[in-house]
């Protein structure tokens, strides 16, 4: 060992001494400091002892160490007079780390404490996304979030996740990742796009503040934000950004075991169900975009377009659950309803486009409005779950309107115009009717929380947030008022019919015919309320005065809050024609055959 010239006289002991019996006191020749040296025999049988005097740069002057040769397997005897040990005390160590510690070699590499992955128990490589985990679970979690993957469990969602079985059930593995503290938002904020054109503009106008969320439509477990430029080149930011995933991370299962988002007890877990409507919407949107751009190179005749639509709706039909649905006959046939009446749509003559409806405008089948929530239910509320639930409600509302014979009698062009004009009102009525099933209050509270954080982070302008907050307040007020009135299924059905057959929208044809249908809906609602709630004289008036509030809600904000997570910059108006072109018999037949 190389060291400066010692300033302390070292006296070695005779190798024949069997035990540490001698204590020598030496004096520093310069300072006069007395140091006690304890000597002992090396148990390795070495003929000569090794006395090592630490350098002044060591742990401290005056430390004397007696150590066995490095090649010896015997224990090392450390003699020291430093402050951390009693002078003259013998400390027996067998590992090099302790020797290095006593020598003051703190910079020498030493064995690290082994940590284990909290998910599978394998050797951890560090803390990733908020939890100590191995490289395998780190990569699995990152892929699941970035690619928006969703999984299903073939068992009871309680599979054992360990080093050897972690790949058997991806659903339970991802679930355990979340339970052990891995954060989805950490994955999203880890990297930023390198494309400058995708960066958020600092001076974004309030009118263009929207969010478009990148989607893996095979299985959208969670939304990943991206900014999509409009046709005019304006980049947009918006309401549901990455922070939405932070502030909306509210457990869907309370501590007492009750579920916030109610689901149908008969519904079974189905793999990929969460993204089914997203696939349909995108198929229709892409087809619409191709047709609007005049790109017919890949879409030859109308037959191919029809087949694209049919395939899309086949997928849609399998996601819906209407056990009581039946194929609707054509308008020329009579329909026997459960109430015993029949509906006949009769045209007086070709020159007079007024149609008379014999029997009730709505049958008992139109009263049933059963929304099936996406399955499997995620443990934490996320943007795609909200958008998927809203999309199912929208499609269910349009299918409900499509099944009314009087509505079909108006013709395809009139149908499209009516639904485009009132889809937001129909959707809002559906929200009020299904508020408990969707846990609407939880969804709105999460959105409000996110908007409050957006104010602090200057992600949205004050005017834009004010508009959205007013819209949410109106929506919540409307739903609360409908719940307070305790509107039943018949009343909701007739209110939707009144909204659907509104003749005052601009650009409508056959306004006289539409007005007659609306009057009939109002009369039938009045008869029902008088018979069912005869003791409540003002009930009908209190119900009808709620309808004007629907016109005060912006369809653009509704679309932005509930649908951009799935369809991006594709408008609802562009999707409506394809939904209404589906043949009712084929549509209902697919639904009946695919009931969950």
From Swiss-Prot:
Instruction: Mark the NR C4-type zinc finger spans by residue number.
Output: 117-137, 153-177
| Predominant subcellular localization, coarse grouping | nucleus
Entries under InterPro entries matching the protein: NHR-like_dom_sf (IPR035500), NR2C1/2-like_DBD (IPR048245), NR2C1/2-like_LBD (IPR048246), Nucl_hrmn_rcpt_lig-bd (IPR000536), Nuclear_hormone_rcpt_NR2 (IPR050274), Nuclear_hrmn_rcpt (IPR001723), Znf_hrmn_rcpt (IPR001628), Znf_NHR/GATA (IPR013088)
What's an example of a GO molecular-function annotation for this chain?
Answer: nuclear receptor activity
One Pfam family it belongs to: zf-C4
Residues the record lists as Phosphoserine modifications: 19, 46, 55, 68, 98, 219
Q: Which residues bind DNA?
A: 114-189
Gene3D superfamilies found in the cross-reference section: Erythroid Transcription Factor GATA-1, subunit A (3.30.50.10), Retinoid X Receptor (1.10.565.10)
State what induces this protein. Induced by oxidative stress via FOXO3 activation.
Q: What is the effect of changing residue 576 to N?
A: Reduces interaction with JAZF1
Domain NR LBD span(s) in chain numbering: 341-583
Q: Which residues carry this modification: N6-acetyllysine?
A: 231
Keyword field: Acetylation, Activator, Differentiation, DNA-binding, Isopeptide bond, Metal-binding, Nucleus, Phosphoprotein, Receptor, Repressor, Spermatogenesis, Transcription, Transcription regulation, Ubl conjugation, Zinc, Zinc-finger
In which compartments does the protein localize? Answer: Nucleus
**Modifications made to the protein after synthesis:** Phosphorylation on Ser-19 and Ser-68 is an important regulator of NR2C2-mediated transcriptional activity. Phosphorylation on these residues recruits the corepressor, NRIP1, leading to transcripional repression, whereas the non-phosphorylated form preferentially recruits the coactivator, PCAF.
Disulphide bonds annotated for this chain are none
Q: Which GO terms describe its biological process?
A: cell differentiation; negative regulation of transcription by RNA polymerase II; nervous system development; positive regulation of canonical NF-kappaB signal transduction; positive regulation of embryonic development; positive regulation of JNK cascade; positive regulation of transcription by RNA polymerase II; regulation of DNA-templated transcription
The UniProt entry's sequence similarity note says: Belongs to the nuclear hormone receptor family. NR2 subfamily.
From the Swiss-Prot or TrEMBL record, give the protein name.
Nuclear receptor subfamily 2 group C member 2
């Amino acid at each position: 060992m190389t060291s400066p010239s010692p300033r302390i006289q070292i006296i070695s002991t005779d190798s024949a001494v069997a035990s540490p019996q001698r204590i020598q006191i030496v004096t520093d020749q310069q300072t006069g400091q007395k140091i006690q040296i304890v000597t002992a025999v090396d148990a390795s049988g070495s003929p000569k002892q090794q006395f090592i005097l630490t350098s002044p740069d060591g742990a401290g002057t005056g430390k004397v160490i007696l150590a066995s040769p490095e090649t010896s397997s015997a224990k090392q005897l450390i003699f020291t007079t430093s402050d951390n040990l009693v002078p003259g005390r013998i400390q027996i160590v067998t590992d090099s780390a302790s020797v290095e510690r006593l020598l003051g070699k703190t910079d020498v590499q030493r064995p690290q404490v082994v940590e284990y992955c909290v998910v599978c128990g394998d050797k951890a490589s560090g803390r990733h996304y908020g939890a100590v985990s191995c490289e395998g679970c780190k990569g699995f979690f990152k892929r699941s979030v970035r690619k928006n993957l969703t999984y299903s469990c073939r068992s009871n969602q309680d599979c054992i996740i360990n080093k050897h079985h972690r790949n058997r059930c991806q659903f339970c593995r991802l679930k355990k990742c979340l339970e052990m503290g891995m954060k989805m938002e950490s994955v999203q904020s880890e990297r930023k796009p390198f494309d400058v054109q995708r960066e958020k503009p600092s001076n974004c106008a309030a009118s263009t503040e929207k969010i478009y969320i990148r989607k893996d439509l095979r299985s959208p477990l969670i939304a990943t934000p991206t900014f999509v430029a409009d046709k005019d080149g304006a980049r947009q930011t918006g309401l549901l950004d990455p922070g939405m995933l932070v502030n909306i991370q509210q457990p869907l299962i309370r501590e007492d075991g009750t579920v916030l988002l109610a689901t149908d007890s008969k519904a079974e877990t189905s793999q990929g169900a969460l993204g089914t409507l997203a696939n349909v919407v995108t198929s229709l949107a892409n087809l619409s975009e191709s047709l609007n751009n005049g790109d017919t190179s890949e879409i030859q005749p109308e037959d191919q377009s029809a087949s694209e639509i049919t395939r899309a709706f086949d997928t849609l039909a399998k996601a819906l659950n209407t056990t009581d649905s039946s194929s609707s006959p054509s308008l020329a046939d009579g329909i026997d309803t459960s109430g015993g009446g029949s509906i006949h749509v009769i045209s007086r003559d070709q020159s007079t486009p007024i149609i008379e409806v014999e029997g009730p405008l709505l049958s008992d089948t139109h009263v049933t409005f059963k929304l099936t929530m996406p399955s499997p239910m995620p443990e934490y509320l996320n943007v795609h779950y909200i958008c998927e639930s809203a999309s199912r409600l929208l499609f269910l509302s349009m299918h409900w309107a499509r099944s009314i014979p009087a509505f079909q009698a108006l013709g395809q062009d009139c149908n499209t115009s009516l639904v485009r004009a009132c889809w937001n009102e129909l959707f809002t009525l559906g929200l009020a009717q299904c508020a408990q099933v969707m846990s609407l209050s939880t969804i709105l509270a999460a959105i409000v929380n996110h908007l409050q954080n957006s104010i602090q982070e200057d992600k949205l302008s004050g005017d834009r947030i004010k508009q959205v907050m007013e819209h949410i307040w109106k929506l919540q007020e409307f739903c609360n008022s409908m719940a307070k009135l305790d509107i039943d299924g018949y009343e909701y059905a007739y209110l939707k019919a009144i909204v659907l057959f509104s003749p005052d929208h601009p650009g409508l044809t056959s306004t006289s015919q539409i007005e007659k249908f609306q009057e009939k809906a109002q009369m039938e609602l009045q008869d029902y309320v008088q018979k069912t709630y005869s003791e409540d004289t003002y009930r009908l008036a209190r119900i009808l005065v709620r309808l004007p509030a629907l016109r005060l809600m912006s369809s653009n904000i509704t679309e932005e809050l509930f649908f951009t997570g799935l369809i991006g910059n594709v408008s609802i108006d562009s999707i409506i024609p394809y939904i209404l072109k589906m043949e009712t018999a084929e549509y209902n037949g697919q639904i009946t055959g695919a009931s969950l």
